[in-house]
Amino acid sequence: MGSDEVLVKEQQKMQKLLHDLKVSASRVRSSQLAPLVEIVTEFGTCLTTLVELMLSSKVEQVVLSVQQAASLTELETALGRVTRLGLEGNHLCRLVARHGGVRLLVEMLTSTKWLPARGSLLRTLGTVCCVLEAIRQLEEVRGVEVIARLVGDSGAREPERAEAAGVLAQMNDLTIRYESFV
């Protein structure tokens, strides 16, 4: 089922729940609050699902804007959007990873076309790779090796090497914290 279909289904469910809530509230007595609480709880679940779908859709659009960038200016603008999403919290970083953002950033990092944007690409990766899902995706696409090679590349500019080292340090710190937590 596509996200539009799920969105419509959730919207219809919320409309029905609101109707049920109105009917129940008009008939409720203090001793019969359980049905009302059940409806409100289900409404909250629907609302959470709708918000998640809407956020996911917006994040997907932002990741797509990175992929479709035709110029360095467009790419820098799109990377700024992804970075701002990442700074909003871990949940949005997970959504960026879910929509292939980490994979895309690593692909662009290895492209000679986007060589002038390597620092920004690394900074964006560092922002997004603050959650386990993003780190796993980074490992799956061999991004760790790509970034490690940049750290050791004497031909790379110093700011790029510093950004690359920062991504690796953050990723290792998060991995160690996660493993010690488990």
Which residues make up each language-model segment?
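Long amphipathic alpha-helical tracts in eukaryotic proteins
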Residues: 1-182
